[in-house]
Amino acid sequence: MTDVTAYAPRKIAHSEFVDMRGLKCHVRRWGPRDAQPLVLLHGSRDCGATFQFIVDQFAGDYHVIAPDWRGYGRTDWNPQGYWFQDYLADLDIVLDALVPGVAVPIAGHSMGGQAAGIYAGVRPQRVSKLIALDAFGLVDSDPSETPDYLSKWIRIWREGPEQSRPYETLAQMAERLVQTNRRLTMDKALFLAAESSRQRPDGLLEWAFDPLHRAPFAVTHRKAEWAACMMRIEAPTLWLVSGRVSRIESEPGGLAARAALVKNVVCHKVEETSHNLHHDRPAEVARIMEAFLNAG
């Protein structure tokens, strides 16, 4: 247990919902509506509140828009399951609803960064600048594992996914987050636990994402297809690299070879950070992002 007080946001997010292809999508918005827009896309098993710490560190005013992806946070779950390509279509709808007709800067972490990068390649007219936080494509799946992979996918659909573990208190959930990332401070963990959880009918707490997200996508990753999208990106791009060692570095050329696919990219490593670099060093991440957004 802990007697630490939860992190108190300096800038307050306002919640609203937009229709997203038949689902009710929850969106957090910070800052004046007439300020420069900035769209932030969260990663797997997370929600838009994950960006609160960097939003609080921005020196300038931005109209920050952070949707919860389908099946995450306060956005509706999809009983038919999830395909990665859904995120691209969902993002297109959210942009048309909230910032129609203009190219906007988009930043994404992990899965959200993967979606942002691919979207920037297939809809370049909608992205003015692109920021990827530890999101530089995946390592190719082993084709020989495809039969077992698809067998698992079928089994989960027939038997149901592993259900979320129940917790009695937010403090227990916060402690779980700290166990996963030892750099995360308890005050931030308590904030994230409160924003990323929901209460069950029996009064216990659970993480607010659809357990179906634990199922694998039905289509395995293909690096060549990802690379083709990267080569279509027109927007100036910033890759923010965490301090962890990535599997990508085991490839020939490592991260540099992947970065070379993008026409106009700058890579910046944020030392002494985990995959969640926006939690570990939010002031530095915000400073680097803001300098990039304001350049040119």
Task: Give residue spans per PLM region.
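Alpha/beta-hydrolase fold catalytic core
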Residues: 1-38, 59-62, 99-102, 137, ...
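Conserved HGGG/HGGXW glycine-rich cap/lid loop of the alpha/beta-hydrolase fold
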Residues: 26-77
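Conserved acidic catalytic loop of the alpha/beta-hydrolase fold
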Residues: 88-103
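Conserved hydrolase catalytic core segment
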Residues: 101-146
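A catalytic-pocket lid/entrance helix-loop region that shapes and gates access to the active site
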Residues: 133-166
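Conserved alpha/beta-hydrolase catalytic His-Asp/Glu region
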Residues: 161-220, 229
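Conserved loop-alpha-helix segment in the C-terminal half of the alpha/beta-hydrolase fold
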Residues: 232-273
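Catalytic histidine-centered segment of alpha/beta-hydrolase-like enzymes
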Residues: 273-282, 286
